[in-house]
């Protein structure tokens, strides 16, 4: 079973409009509300793929109750309740444009943060792999993910970590390392304080920087150009076919689902990388975020090429 962790989930509300009129009333006929957050996208994709998944994270108030109720019934859930209210994130879809209004979310009390660590520790007993995704809510220390990684390491459970900015920096500077990280070029540039290109020789050098020491897998998305990956001392380039992109949002989360599934099933390097890329591409072909059509899985799978470089 895979444990997904979403520390700052949201109710994602979609308002489709023909036109967004400013400073007047806009009436919406077809409103969509879903359980949102990067970790919950991972959860949905794992469930659709057919893997057993347990979802956890922080929820609060009536919106927190709504969120838990709107997660697929096939998914096991064990969220931790806090005093603050789960946030709303609103997307206004007008014409070809998308305007987002994102609430900051609740402020987590120090004791709640400590109590979740105990909750997380107990959940580790019943899972084989952990996937941690997204931002940290206000109130938690910047190195909170390092604490989760430490507990998972102590329990002998591999961790796939998908976060960015100060939270990722804190983990990289910690003695407790996740099994997998998946930064993109922009995030690599931010971490190293210099521009990082997609040149394979440069990426090889970058991923051997001391900052990344001790991390077993580093998987770098190159968008339409595929993926560059480092596993131990071996480097890989994944070539992907061109596809019709409908909605790329959530493709990174779908990739995390594939990585986690590959670890769960102890797949070869090539199998893990292909599965991760295929699930990311399948998500990009769908309108709904964090959703894959498994009917197209094998067709794409057979087109991917993994080369050791």
Curated annotation (Swiss-Prot):
Listed HAMAP family: LacC (MF_01557)
Protein name: Tagatose-6-phosphate kinase
Family the entry assigns: Belongs to the carbohydrate kinase PfkB family. LacC subfamily.
GO cellular component: cytosol
Enzyme class: transferase
Any one GO BP annotation for this protein: lactose catabolic process via tagatose-6-phosphate
Gene Ontology MF term list: ATP binding; phosphofructokinase activity; tagatose-6-phosphate kinase activity
Pathway assigned in UniProt: Carbohydrate metabolism; D-tagatose 6-phosphate degradation; D-glyceraldehyde 3-phosphate and glycerone phosphate from D-tagatose 6-phosphate: step 1/2
Entry-linked InterPro entries: Carboh/pur_kinase_PfkB_CS, LacC, PfkB_dom, Ribokinase-like, Tagatose/fructose_Pkinase
E.C. no: 2.7.1.144
CDD domains per UniProt: FruK_PfkB_like
Keywords for this protein: ATP-binding, Kinase, Lactose metabolism, Nucleotide-binding, Transferase
Transmembrane residue ranges: none
SUPFAM superfamilies membership: Ribokinase-like (SSF53613)
Catalytic activity: D-tagatofuranose 6-phosphate + ATP = D-tagatofuranose 1,6-bisphosphate + ADP + H(+)
Pfam short name (any one): PfkB
């Amino acid at each position: 079973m895979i444990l997904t962790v979403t520390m700052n989930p949201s109710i994602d509300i979609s308002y489709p409009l023909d036109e967004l009129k400013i400073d007047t009333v806009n009436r919406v006929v077809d409103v969509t509300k879903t359980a949102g957050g990067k970790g919950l996208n991972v959860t949905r994709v794992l469930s659709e793929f057919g893997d057993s998944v347990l979802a956890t994270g922080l929820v609060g108030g009536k919106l927190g109750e709504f969120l838990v109720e709107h997660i697929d019934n096939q998914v096991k859930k064990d969220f931790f309740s806090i005093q603050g209210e789960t946030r709303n994130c609103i997307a206004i879809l007008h014409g070809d444009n998308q305007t987002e209004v994102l609430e900051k979310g609740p402020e987590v009390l120090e004791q709640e943060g400590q109590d979740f660590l105990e909750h997380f520790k107990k959940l580790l007993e019943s899972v084989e792999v952990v996937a941690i995704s997204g931002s940290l809510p206000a109130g938690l220390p910047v190195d909170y993910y390092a604490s989760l990684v430490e507990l998972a390491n102590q329990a002998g459970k591999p961790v796939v970590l998908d976060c960015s900015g100060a939270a990722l920096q804190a983990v990289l500077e910690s003695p407790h390392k996740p099994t997998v990280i998946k930064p993109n070029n922009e995030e690599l540039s931010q971490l190293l304080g210099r521009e990082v290109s997609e040149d394979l020789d440069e990426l090889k050098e970058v991923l051997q920087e001391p900052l990344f020491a001790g991390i077993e897998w580093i998987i770098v998305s190159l968008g339409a150009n595929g993926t560059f990956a480092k596993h131990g001392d071996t480097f890989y380039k994944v070539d992907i076919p061109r596809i019709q992109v409908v909605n790329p949002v959530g493709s990174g989360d779908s990739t995390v689902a594939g990585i986690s599934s590959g670890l769960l099933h102890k797949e070869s390097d090539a199998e893990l990388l292909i599965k991760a890329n295929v699930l990311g591409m399948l998500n990009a072909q769908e309108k709904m975020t964090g959703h894959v059509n498994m009917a197209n899985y094998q067709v794409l799978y057979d087109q991917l090429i993994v080369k050791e470089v």
